A protein has these predicted regions:
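Beta/alpha (TIM)-barrel catalytic core signal, keyed to glycine-rich beta->alpha loops juxtaposed to Asp/Glu
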Residues: 111-273
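Glycine/small-residue-rich loop that forms an oxyanion/phosphate-binding "nest" at active or ligand-binding sites
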Residues: 76-122
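Acidic (Asp/Glu)-rich catalytic clusters
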Residues: 10, 58-68, 92-101, 129, ...
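Short, acidic/polar
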Residues: 25-37, 83-98, 145-147, 169-170
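A structural motif
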Residues: 42, 100-103, 134, 158
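Acidic-and-aromatic substrate-binding clefts and catalytic sites of carbohydrate-active enzymes
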Residues: 25-28, 48-56, 80-85, 113-116, ...
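N-terminal binding-site loop/beta-alpha segment at the start of enzyme catalytic domains
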Residues: 1-71, 192, 256
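Alpha-helical scaffolding within the catalytic cores
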Residues: 2-7, 55, 59-62, 90-93, ...
Length: 273
């Protein structure tokens, strides 16, 4: 089994560069799927309050036989849980659902600029970090304007920003902002929900390397220094998505994938929340 490379977050905590996401996995399928992922070698599991499957993720983690300290568990607070006290309560609910003593990473799922409470919410996450309830704190779907406010008005720079990112939406400007401020970039929908598998460039590279289109795209993420959290409920695809460490894309092939940028989103823009 290949070891997953790790990246070091800005507070020294290490995170696997490839994780397993459980978005839209029904609760009745989640425990099995997460167990399959852990058996395949994944050590990072990403869930959220919104997904309604935290309890099943926790059950799979507990039943895996893998020591807790070898697993990296992420969850996120939802939009109706913004505010200092509300965020603290949301964390305790999620920790209770997961059945874990601590979390590895806790994220604000969306900035919700119309609500404008993400700064006080972030201050609650800072308290959770200082209390030792979570090893690292970060955000999701934040734009530079949102990140800049957190940096200027609070004490801790987010360790990570989880954003939609794939070859059609490479997010170069946001990635540059992250790099300048020591914020790790994590990709949700790293495979663009499968919409690029028939793309001629991706399909051609899959033939060239004898790999699946998904493996080509995931390899692109890894070689660019992005953390990727693909999701699948199919055991064979869960395993195939993990099998991306035995080859490397040539520099010109990375460049060819970089040219596929169309600024296409498969999900919502943060300003629309």
């Amino acid at each position: 089994m290949d070891a997953v490379p790790e990246l070091t977050l800005n507070n020294g905590v290490r995170i696997p560069q490839l994780g397993y996401g459980v978005y839209k996995l029904p609760p009745e399928e989640t425990e099995r799927a997460v167990g399959t992922a852990i058996e395949a070698g994944y050590r990072s599991i990403d869930t959220a309050k919104l997904y309604r499957n935290e309890r099943e993720v926790g059950k799979a983690v507990g039943a895996s036989g893998v020591p807790r300290e070898e697993l990296f568990v992420t969850t996120k607070l939802w939009n109706d849980e913004h505010g200092y006290e509300a965020a603290l309560a949301a964390f305790e609910r999620s920790r209770g659902e997961l059945g874990l003593d601590y979390l590895d990473l806790y994220l604000i799922h969306w900035p919700v600029p119309s609500l404008d409470r993400y700064v006080e919410t972030w201050k609650a996450l800072q308290k959770l970090l200082s209390d030792g309830s979570v090893r690292a704190i970060g955000v999701s779907n934040f734009q530079p304007v949102h990140l800049r406010r957190l940096i200027e008005q609070t004490e801790i720079v987010p360790a990570l920003n989880q954003i939609e990112l794939h070859p059609q939406l490479p997010q170069e400007e946001l990635r540059a902002f992250h790099a300048a401020h020591g914020i790790a970039t994590e990709a949700w929908a790293p495979l663009a929900r499968g919409s690029m598998f028939s793309n001629s460039t991706i399909a051609g590279l899959a033939r060239k390397y004898g790999r699946t289109p998904a493996q080509i795209i995931l390899r692109w993420h890894l070689q660019r220094g992005t953390i990727a959290i693909p999701k699948s409920a199919t055991p064979s695809r869960i395993a195939a998505n993990f099998d991306v460490f035995g080859f490397e894309l040539a520099a010109d092939d990375i460049a060819a994938i970089n040219e596929l940028d169309t600024n296409h989103r498969t999900g919502l823009h943060p300003d629309g929340m």
